[in-house]
From Swiss-Prot:
One term of GO molecular function: metal ion binding
Amino acids binding Zn(2+): Y108, H112
Name listed for the protein in its UniProt record: Ranasmurfin
Subcellular location: Secreted
Keyword RNA-binding among record annotations: no
Keywords tagged on the record: Disulfide bond, LTQ, Metal-binding, Oxidation, Secreted, TPQ, Zinc
Source species: Polypedates leucomystax
Gene Ontology CC annotations of this record: extracellular region
InterPro entries, A to Z: MB_blue_pigment_sf
Tissue: Foam nest.
Length: 113
């Protein structure tokens, strides 16, 4: 079981819920950025993406946000669609993905492939 490292949102029914969690909680930000990096390397390492998606799903449960994001893990045809919904829910610009991944790797000292 996943242990939540941050409290649930005070606005669980809002469309802004996940975006707010991204701003307020390091634990959620870490899982979100890990998912971005895993997505950018999806073709080389699909397993890593699946793991990151599962971790992110657990972190979403911790937020209490009703909106949620279906990442379609295990369904390669729908990965792109799920990731687009993730970006929209978290209000992340697609153009920023590379920089966010680099930032994540620096913040958490993750070796770059």
């Amino acid at each position: 079981a996943y242990a939540c490292s941050f409290p649930p949102s005070e606005i669980p029914g809002s469309k802004e819920c996940l975006a707010e969690a991204l701003q307020k909680h390091q634990g959620f930000k870490k899982k979100s950025y890990a998912l971005i990096c895993a997505y950018l390397n999806y073709k080389e390492d699909a397993e890593n993406y699946e793991r990151a998606a599962e971790d992110f799903d657990s972190a979403v449960k911790c937020t209490g946000c009703k909106e949620g994001v279906d990442l379609h893990e295990g369904n390669p045809e729908l990965i792109e669609e799920g990731f687009e919904k993730f970006l929209a829910s978290l209000k992340i610009d697609r153009k920023a993905l590379g920089s966010l991944c680099t930032l994540f790797q620096k913040l958490y000292a993750i070796p770059h492939n």
